[in-house]
Amino acid sequence: MKHKINDSAENVRNAIDNYIIGFKALRNREILKDHYIDGLTFEEIAEKHDMSVRQVKKIAYDNEPVFIEHLRT
């Protein structure tokens, strides 16, 4: 599930910081910010975090609905 995010970087950053919680949340927040705010590709993020592209995509797609829901409220 991929959404077009038409919100300010500040609002996206706040939603990610406030609603991405749990195990490995810090890493997941950084990955989401790299992609949705800084515009890095999944390949660039995977290299940066020493992960596979598949892992990065899974983190992004699994967590996207969580913070997107809070952008709409």
Predicted regions and their residues:
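Short alpha-helical "recognition helix" segments of helix-turn-helix
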Residues: 44-49
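General nucleic-acid-binding
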Residues: 1-6
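Key DNA-contact positions within bacterial/archaeal DNA-binding proteins
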Residues: 54
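Short, Lys/Arg-enriched anionic-surface-contact patches
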Residues: 7-27
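C-terminal flanking helix
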Residues: 63-72
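Short amphipathic alpha helix immediately N-terminal
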Residues: 22-38
